Regions:
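Repeat-blade elements of multi-bladed beta-propeller folds
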Residues: 1-22, 35-62, 75-102, 115-143, ...
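Short loop/turn segments that connect beta-strands within beta-propeller blades
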Residues: 25-29, 65-69, 105-109, 146-150, ...
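A short beta-strand motif characteristic of beta-propeller blades
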Residues: 30-35, 70-75, 110-115, 150-155, ...
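Sequence/structural signature of beta-propeller modules
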Residues: 266-273
């Protein structure tokens, strides 16, 4: 299983590389139903109003009604999809290996707009502040579009951008295979700082209480002040996605282990008198 499961009420939605969507009882793990797509699903569930939106390796985007257990619509992109969907307003946003970002109507799957980026889209777009931030792996870049499809800016890096971006405080954070964590202003795309983490930063960063965390293939986690990039924490384990449990503790994912550590604290800015 390559996709993260999703909790929906008392159910757990799981996408499988065997081409099945499974809905399980949260309490017991009992299978409620399984729906066969027939293609590996690396895209994680994105569920709104009982409908699961996702893509598959066969190049299709699906909307599956989990309550009625039937397919609402299918859109054929023609290119492999590993990206998860992002929903915002009246759009489903998802990237494909054809180097495109798709904006589809949630109710019908009809195209709102399609735009090209520099290369394959492996990660999930982030939508915030009226903008869609799209990582490109082979394009080695992050591109911002308006929700209407106008390209606003692009930031190039020295390596693949597999990482899905995180947005906090008017800034966009993402990692690159050049070993750096980037902080970019959401408006205008100006690079505010770059932090060398080492290895390849392939996992999505997470921002907790003003501290941005990123892991790398060098098996280390770094926590930095989200505003300045100053390093506040170095943890010699972990590799992929840092997740906040309660704002005070972090769950850090390694290759085969899960670590729980105390979250770093960002220094308070002195008040002016």
């Amino acid at each position: 299983m390559a996709a993260s499961p999703a909790i929906v009420g008392d159910a757990l939605v799981v996408h499988g590389m065997d081409g099945y969507v499974r809905v399980l009882e949260r309490s017991s793990g009992r299978l409620r139903f399984a729906y066969r797509i027939g293609s590996p699903i690396e895209s994680s569930p994105m569920v709104r109003d009982g409908v699961d939106y996702f893509g598959a390796w066969n190049g299709n985007v699906y909307a599956l009604d989990l309550r009625r257990r039937r397919l609402v619509w299918r859109f054929r992109s023609g290119h492999k999809i590993t990206s998860s969907a992002a929903l915002a307003g009246r759009s489903v946003y998802i990237g494909d290996y054809g180097g495109r970002i798709l904006s589809l109507w949630p109710g019908s799957g009809r195209v709102r707009w399609i735009r090209r980026v520099d290369g394959r889209v492996y990660g999930t777009p982030a939508v915030a502040r009226g903008r869609v931030f799209v990582p490109s792996s082979t394009g080695r870049s992050l591109t911002a579009f308006s929700t209407g499809g106008r390209r606003l800016w692009r930031v190039r890096t020295g390596g693949y951008v597999y990482s899905s971006p995180a947005v906090w405080g008017g800034r966009v954070y993402f990692g690159s295979y050049d070993g750096r964590l980037y902080a970019v202003r959401a408006r205008g795309g100006r690079v505010l700082w770059r932090l060398r983490v080492g290895g390849h930063v392939s996992g999505a960063p997470a921002v907790v209480a003003g501290v941005v965390y990123a892991g790398s293939t060098a098996e280390r986690i770094v926590g930095a002040d989200a505003r300045t990039g100053r390093v506040l924490l170095r943890f010699p384990h972990g590799q992929y996605v840092p997740v906040s449990g309660n704002g005070r503790r972090l769950l850090l994912h390694g290759y085969s282990r899960l670590y729980a550590v105390e979250a770093a604290r960002r220094p308070r800015t002195p008040r002016r008198r």
